[in-house]
Amino acid sequence: MSGPQDILIGEDKLTEKCGVFGTFGASKEAARLAYYGLWALQHRGQESSGIASADTKNIYDHSDFGLVAHVYKDEDLSALHGHVSIGHNRYSTSGGRDACYNQPLINKDRTLAFAHNGNLPETHKLEKFLKKHKVEIGALNDSGMMAAAIEVYMQDGLTIEDAIEKSYPLFQGVFSALAMGKDRLVAFRDKFGIRPLSIAELDGGYVVSSETCAYDTIGAKF
């Protein structure tokens, strides 16, 4: 995307929310689909952009500060292998301008990638849970705490789906989120459905997005 609207970071109508996009089974180059999806969602966040992908063996990722068109080179996308991917355009609501807050977040074992749009104004229960499980929360924003809670249950042997179900009551706020493992993608949002998230079909697979405008870019059927 080009034009002056891309750099109006102070405009509320352009920077009030992040954008998330994910794809599963719609292409062997899922990261490229995520790139086009994030391009269409550029208006939802201009601070940073990131994509994570997986090929059943590994999780790969690339993120940086800036607009989608500037963050990814062709070689970056070529290095993001696999048939599943998630992407994120960030407008910060918590945390600061630090690379550690760029999303998708990847855990140390590289078994979980997490992208989140929303805000958790009440994190007392979540913080208490993480402290109980010896998770250092000092540098974590709400997105990081959500990912950490899911990882706690995954370390107990639960699948990503079950780990999300177990940790879901701890997430007090409004959000839409994507969690990706090496062979799966899970999309979920707050119980009131306040933050937008939809699903569409493409070439026998699925794509999910914060806004349906991203589907037009890649030809997905909503």
Ranges and model annotations:
Residues 1-222:
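Conserved short alpha-helical segments that host acidic/polar catalytic motifs at enzyme active sites
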